[in-house]
UniProtKB/Swiss-Prot annotation:
The keyword Protein transport does not apply. Heptamer of 7 subunits arranged in a ring. Interacts with the chaperonin GroEL. One of its GO terms (biological process) is chaperone cofactor-dependent protein refolding. This is Co-chaperonin GroES. The keyword Ribosomal protein does not apply. One of its GO terms (cellular component) is cytoplasm. Belongs to the GroES chaperonin family. NCBIfam families: PRK00364.2-2 (NF001531), PRK00364.2-4 (NF001533), PRK00364.2-5 (NF001534).
Length: 96
């Protein structure tokens, strides 16, 4: 797991990994693929302040979430790719 602790209302998400794709005998490179918009919450911030009170985040570590296509900041840590996004950029929690 990454040793990154998001601040405030931010969430650290590990995007779902796509399998390598081939169309016929042609390999489709990562740069030509759509980025996944689903991932697993790895770490969460402490929450956000509203009217002087700390409001905890609704998502929890381990939740699978859907987020906007252009949401967040991509980072790499310990050889893995992560996104740091605001909780407000999370569109839904996937119930399995």
């Amino acid at each position: 797991m990454a040793s990154i602790k998001p601040l405030g209302d931010r969430v650290l998400v590990e995007p779902r990994q796509e399998a390598e794709e081939k169309i016929g005998s042609i390999f489709v490179p990562d740069t030509a693929k759509e980025k996944p918009q689903e991932g697993k919450v790895v770490e969460i911030g402490s929450g956000k302040y509203e009217d002087g009170k700390l409001v905890p985040l609704e998502v929890k570590v381990g939740d699978t979430v859907l987020y906007g296509k252009y949401s967040g900041t991509e980072i790499k840590s310990e050889g893995k790719e992560y996104l740091i996004i605001r909780e407000s950029d999370i569109l839904a929690v996937v119930k399995k």
